[in-house]
Amino acid sequence: MLSLRYSLPYLLLQTRESSTKLFTKKPNNVVVCAARGPRPRSPRVWKTRKRIGTISKAAKMIACIKGLSNVKEEVYGALDSFIAWELEFPLVIVKKALVILEDEKEWKKIIQVTKWMLSKGQGRTMGTYFSLLNALAEDNRLDEAEELWNKLFMEHLEGTPRKFFNKMISIYYKRDMHQKLFEVFADMEELGVKPNVAIVSMVGKVFVKLEMKDKYEKLMKKYPPPQWEFRYIKGRRVKVKAKQLNELSEGEGGLSSDEDKIDNEIESEEEDGEDLSEEEEDEKELLGGSQGQITSREPSLDHLDSS
């Protein structure tokens, strides 16, 4: 007679083993959809209004004051109405508007917008004061420029940036105000602010013009022209041969666009100094290659101010 008493436990063991295998397997057996990436989402219907960027807002701000006269109350009223519905003061928009006005050389509007911003207690930075100083100089408002310079110099005596000294020296150099130029240069030396090549060349030209050869020689001996300088080429700091700058760069508070007289003098001097022979140029290239320095192919910085 056939006995089946061991068949049932055997089946139970089989089912238990299979069930444990099913539940103990790793989750890598989960079926992955063929279309990878984030699932598609429907557009959000509650964002129906397009957002206006800061550049377009700056353009609107310029448009609202462009057709107005230079009356202070009229311009200030238009600017107040423009920011009436803003929860916070739109400092970024005003800064971008000032950059656009500076590109368009609207010096009167720059002065008005900057003074309006400062009256609100906003944007009190050295960059704002420098743009105001530059606009006052371009608009031939020398008294206000000197007043602003004296105020900043007295408040930030040792912390005055070098570009402010450079700007004031360039202003006095253009207008042949030699005594005030010497005063600013003396303040630089007293505070230990090292002048750049452009400042040294401008002060040296004034010494030569006034026939002060002894002071010119002392100046050139104290501040000799540098042989090397550092530049950033494609994000890397590279040591290159220094180019003798005869005018200030815009980043250092250089000469303004209206200073054509200085530009013409410097260009004529550069043309006279470009009479080097080919042998001397070859020797310079060989010397530069033997020292293993990287030369720059950037254009000369002497013509940045005229742009």
From Swiss-Prot:
Keyword terms, alphabetized: Coiled coil, Repeat
NCBIfam families for the chain: PPR (TIGR00756)
Biased composition (Acidic residues): 260-284
Residues in coiled coil: 238-292
Species of provenance: Arabidopsis thaliana (Mouse-ear cress)
Sequence ranges of the PPR repeats: 125-159, 161-195
InterPro entries documented for this protein: EMB1417-like, Pentatricopeptide_rpt, TPR-like_helical_dom_sf
Source taxonomy: Eukaryota, Viridiplantae, Streptophyta, Embryophyta, Tracheophyta
Descriptive protein name: Pentatricopeptide repeat-containing protein At4g21190
Family of the protein in this entry: Belongs to the PPR family. P subfamily.
Domain of life: Eukaryota
Keyword field contains Coiled coil: yes
Start and end residues of each stretch annotated as Disordered: 248-307
Gene from which this protein is expressed: EMB1417
